[in-house]
Amino acid sequence: MYNLWVAWLGVLLPLIKFIHSVLKPALPPVIKNQPFNIFWAAPTMQCQHFFNVDLTLQLFNIISNPLENQRGSTIVIFYPNELGYYPYFSQDGKPFNGGIPQNMSLSKHLKKTADDIANVISWWRSEGLVVIDWESWKPQWGRNWGNRLIYRNYSLAFTRNRHPEWSEMKVNTVAQQEFENAGRSFMHTTLSLALEMRPKCLWGFYLYPDCYNYDYKINPQTYTGKCPKDEIFHNDQLQWLWEKSTALYTSIYLDKILKSSLNALKFVHYRVREAMRIAEMARRDYILPVFIFSRPFYLHSIEALSQEDLVHTIGESAALGAAGIILWGGYEYSDSKETCLSVQKSIQGSLGHYAVNVTSAAKFCSQSLCNNNGRCIRKTPESSSYLHMPESSTKKYILSKSFRFIISPTSKLKTIRAMKDGFVCHCYYSWHGESCQRQSSGLLRGKSEAPMTNFNLSVFLSMTFSMILWNSATPSFNVNFSLKY
């Protein structure tokens, strides 16, 4: 078996390299020549204004809105009561805007949505991240369970009250159809209007896609981190949403029970992998940018992530090809001077220094391997290669603005060799070649059919590769959770 596996490697390693060479291109990064960005999306403006605590985000290459709020020139987050008339139930069961999508006027919703977008996002704004955070219900009937059962029950009552003569089977069938059709219309038309009004912004819904790999509490010893097969199937059915989105926004918030564990890495790894899978299938011409919501602290606490979990979250996301991390938090991050100082301590400690490390390494790899025309992604997603600057490099404070890494000539060559061993280039739109050194005029004009051809080939080869590994060497197809610094 060992000899057979070695023989397969001789075939598969060049194949892996070829697969990456025909991947659909990525969109260029939101900041030129900065392939991986870290954004701050916590409302911490009070720390500076009321408590005179400067979080010094810019110093560590962490990008924020000018006022450190959640609705600015860099990133906008629309919550349920801030965009149109989103129908939902409060936690105590009170309906708002009809409660369910089929009980709310879509035209009325869109009219208010247009006003809300115009008021929040200036017409001259050319780019930026815009996240719609609608979490109360899911557009797929079967995903409304637990606290979301109220949407199914209310939909059944809504249909039954209008048609008391119908059988229960017909009521169930029609209620599901009405809910799913109305939910889809709400989300799809909202995105369509948003893109019509602000076409250059990166629009998407928060937690789409989800992986539903939350069973680490139930079976911690046997936890794999993989998305359940039926949830992957459900995600595939949302093609209407993916093809309309211009970015994907999933999340990797870590529960404290996962602290510094292999399960934390498994949890993050497969959530990011699923988002990257959806990003590739969403469009014909390019892969959607994926931004990962994370937190600087463990859930429901102000305990900073450990160094290991910074690697598990920020490091893993960068290595798998995400466009960036969004560090999210609520008003509890700035409700007192003590809390602000805790946030500042985290940023000026391991979080900030690791943020500089990863963003610098991603930039260095893009420059060295991809001619600044692509981002570095792992040759194989299951490897343990990370975008880290060498320990021998030094951080210097440049122009009183931010830290930058300075690498010695000897370390530079060794680092480039190490990056070539673990990473390949994922070229930006209109660029191709092993080092993204060639530009295609056809792709620039948007006329070429090459991306679709490449997509079909890459999907076929990826499926073939996965099947070979699964059938021939299943025990070896495990994520290597050792770390490389």
Residue ranges, per PLM feature:
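Aromatic-lined carbohydrate-recognition surfaces of secreted/lumenal glycan-active proteins
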Residues: 171-234, 268, 283-299
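Substrate-binding cleft of secreted/luminal carbohydrate-active enzymes
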Residues: 28-51, 66-67, 73, 78-81, ...
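Glycoside hydrolase catalytic-domain groove-lining segments
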Residues: 237, 241-244, 249-298
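Alpha-helical scaffolding within the catalytic cores
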Residues: 61-63, 115, 227-239, 270-279, ...
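A solvent-exposed, charged loop/short amphipathic helix patch at secondary-structure junctions
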Residues: 96-100, 144-180
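Cleavable N-terminal signal peptides of Sec/SRP-targeted secreted and luminal proteins
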Residues: 3-21, 458-473
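C-terminal GPI-anchoring signal of eukaryotic secretory precursors
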Residues: 439-460, 473-480
